[in-house]
Amino acid sequence: VTETAVEATRSWLNALSLADSNVAAGELYRSLFTLNRTELKPGTREKILEVYRNPVNTVTASLQSHLGQQPLPLSQNSRRSAKIVRELNREMAVGYKTVVVGLHGSWRQRLFRKSTALPIERALRYLGELLVHCYHVYMPYPPLVWLEVHELFRYAQQLQLESVPVEITSREGAGTTSIKERYSQICLLGLCNPYRLPQGEAKKVHTFLYQWAGMADIQVPAGAESQSGNFSIDLLRDGPPMKSRQPVSAGMAKRVRVLDASSLVEKTKSFIRRLEQGEPASQLPLGTECLDSACLEMFRRVLRSWDEASLRQHNRSRGKGLVSVCIGIESAHFFADGQRPFLPPEEIVVASEDMGDSGVTDSDEHSYIDFDLPIESDTEKPESAEAVVKDNFHITRWKVVDQSASGMLLRSREAPGMQVRVGDILGIQFDVAADSVWWPAVVRRLQGDAKGIVEVGVELLASHYEPVTVRVANGSAIFRPALLLPPLETTEHRRPQSLVFSRGAFRDPAGLQLSIISGDKVRNVRPLKLVERSGSFEQVYFADLMEADS
């Protein structure tokens, strides 16, 4: 039985044990579901929902803390937990939207126009929490969520309520916000390619934006060409804002708004400069908690999303067939090395071996490809074969959904040994023949659904790689497996040879001399430039050392 009086609701919630978050979440969901389908006066419903806020926020935060670091596919229990968090946020949003609808045209709204600001802000808040939760666990967000977000903001603009202060008292802290700030926070997160962010980073960016989204402005289009840091919001589109450099046509002006984030872009650049200069992240007013290097990498990713148009560089075509995939550097090394266990060389004779010109120049830059692709809503079942298990390494079979010159969208059903995260290195084999070449790739985008189906957008790093052994030169350091990627020269890009090894395998690799061992050949090199660092790997360009230098 759901209580429909404020004090009775308060008493029931005070007696509800939150020790078991899953049980408490189920009780809260059932009660909210019934409440939202019960006739109540708007004022009474709003007061009851305000009482629900703290227990709902507490339970969802507890469940999310257990979900945030799990690879895909999630276990069945974790998928149930993820679903209940999503539905709790949805029901809270439904409740506050019901208040807004009940107030529309009422005497209370006519006399106390600003009273509508609170339920609009709260509905936006929980729709935003629904979205960030889906990004956090890489699950698809429900259809029409973005359309509801835009509609609430448009309604607030009609009532001239978008800048009215709204009180907040929750785990966010006490203070005030506004509908425009809340809407900007949601839109800016949607512009970060959130399904491409490493695990846990969507929530960190969301928290950062809670403090700094007020620096963004939302304007009616002026007709001029869009500037850097400006984004187009189509209020009638079920999707996040888009990067657009074209002027808004007269026919679209009524339904389009311009999100001007240029000031926030400059603020983010200033944080990057201060972190690069060695200031601790804990001493900067970021509004979110992260380690120094992790903060720097996060802000660089955010800046790439906001400051540059992330246009797809290659046309994509529908894929066909299956590929074999192994996940992780050690696994990629194992299968490319003929499934031989990694054994450090017993004796190394240092000799210089010319394995190619590294050709590094200061102008070389890593190219980032956008694979922000939606999951197709077809009913075709992806193929998945049983894992091939040896020494805890696995091969799984993935369907090629589409592909381009530089990447692919792959889909598979959960299988033993399948654990994948954004930023993981993959080995991909296009032919099932035992001697077929393995291609190196990195997971750029990740999404999974409630049925255990996983989709990954991958960037191909090269057409092949060589499994090698690496250690600090002239020392007794531990031998590490690594992947040696060949140079690439095309009309569009010029990339020298590079090494890929596990993150943290070498402390400050840029200042080290490394020995690359391939069979009985040894090559002494010096890392020159960090190309990329993800949560699981580091990729560096390097130059060969002359014999006198080594």
Residues of each region from the PLM?
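Extended, domain-scale alpha-helical bundle/helix-rich regions
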Residues: L161-V349
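Context-gated lysine
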Residues: K41, K47, K83, K97, ...
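Intrinsically disordered, low-complexity regions
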Residues: R10-L13, A25, Y29, I233, ...
